[in-house]
């Protein structure tokens, strides 16, 4: 797969600095330090300029704010854009490998006669489509996917192999579900029996509702609600190995990184970012545009727009003060002991 530099710049509607007179062929995309001839790279930060000096890349996509400085490093062509990261994302789409070809419904797929299958839907071998399931137009369902009774999947979705979608789940349009994720599994609801000798399982009769343009990573589990719905808002992106408990409500445009755990009945606003391995206590509220740091343990509500980190999690500015105080503790103790000694006080 290859494109000319002109084709790429036109695709981005961007101008080129140091534009060569002849045709320049681009055959790959990679990091500046790993690039070879005919590769296109990305330079979007001041500290990356040294990488460009030594890079073997043929050309680069660069942010406008550093383009003049980069142009003086050498005479290689630069595609100048406002946001180099987003521009590279568009070019990655050009070079991306097409999805595995799958046309129509495989003869070994199991589809209940009551299911409603839209136009141009592809269903792979050993997939199971249950009673009264609805699949929207142009959706691709790969091998071994199981979609149970009364579930609804919107249009233009991609469901990778071995995904499980349980009863009554509702999924919007243009969603991507990666292999082995489980949507609508039983919520973790148990109570001690009256005599305290056993544990009683609480039935969960709700469902999961996923908006449109949602991505869900491999091995992520989203539990169904005790009653009502576990809800994932439009445009939210969820990484691999994330646990989302029953009756959780997640807003629009959130990003949840790998190994995060969200306990039952947590409410998360719009635009929230939860970093890897963070844990959130049940029945807490995370306000819109909040940030939760990696490995944070959130034990209480987080106001909108605040950044919290640490265990237990505190506002980042407050936690920084605690960390500074702890680092100074040995020196402080040394001074305190000296004062105590001068006053004949034992510590």
From Swiss-Prot:
It catalyses: a UDP-3-O-[(3R)-3-hydroxyacyl]-alpha-D-glucosamine + a (3R)-hydroxyacyl-[ACP] = a UDP-2-N,3-O-bis[(3R)-3-hydroxyacyl]-alpha-D-glucosamine + holo-[ACP] + H(+). Pathway: Bacterial outer membrane biogenesis; LPS lipid A biosynthesis. The active site is at residue 246. One of its GO terms (molecular function) is N-acyltransferase activity. Belongs to the transferase hexapeptide repeat family. LpxD subfamily. Homotrimer. This is UDP-3-O-acylglucosamine N-acyltransferase 1.
């Amino acid at each position: 797969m290859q494109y000319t530099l002109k084709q790429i710049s036109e695709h981005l509607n961007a101008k080129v600095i140091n534009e060569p007179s002849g045709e320049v062929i681009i055959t790959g995309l990679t990091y500046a330090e790993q690039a070879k001839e005919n590769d296109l790279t990305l330079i979007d930060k001041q500290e990356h300029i040294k990488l460009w000096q030594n890079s073997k890349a043929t050309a680069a996509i660069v942010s406008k704010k550093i383009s003049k400085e980069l142009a003086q490093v050498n005479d290689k062509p630069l595609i100048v854009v406002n946001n180099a990261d987003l521009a590279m994302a568009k070019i990655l789409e050009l070079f991306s490998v097409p999805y595995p070809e799958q046309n129509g419904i495989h003869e070994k797929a199991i589809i209940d006669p009551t299911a409603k299958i839209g136009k141009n839907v592809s269903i792979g071998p050993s997939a199971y489509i249950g009673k009264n399931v609805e699949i929207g137009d142009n959706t691709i369902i790969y091998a071994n996917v199981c979609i149970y009774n009364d579930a609804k999947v919107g249009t233009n979705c991609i469901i990778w192999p071995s995904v499980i979608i349980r009863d009554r789940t509702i999924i919007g349009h243009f969603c991507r579900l990666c292999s082995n994720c489980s949507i609508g599994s039983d919520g973790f609801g148990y109570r001690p029996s009256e005599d305290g000798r056993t544990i009683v399982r609480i039935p969960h009769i709700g469902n999961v509702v996923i908006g449109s343009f949602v991505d869900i990573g491999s091995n992520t589990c989203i539990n169904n609600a005790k009653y009502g719905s576990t809800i994932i808002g439009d445009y939210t992106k969820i990484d691999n190995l994330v646990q989302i408990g029953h009756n959780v409500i997640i807003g629009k445009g959130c990003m949840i990184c790998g190994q995060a755990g969200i306990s039952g009945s947590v409410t998360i606003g719009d635009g929230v970012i939860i970093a890897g391995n963070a844990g959130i206590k049940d029945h807490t509220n995370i306000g819109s545009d909040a940030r939760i740091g990696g490995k944070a343990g959130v034990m209480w509500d987080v106001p909108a727009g605040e950044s919290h980190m640490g265990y237990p999690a505190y506002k980042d500015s407050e936690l920084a003060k605690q960390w500074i105080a702890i680092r100074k503790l040995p020196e402080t103790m040394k001074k305190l002991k000296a004062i105590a000694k001068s006053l004949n006080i034992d510590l």
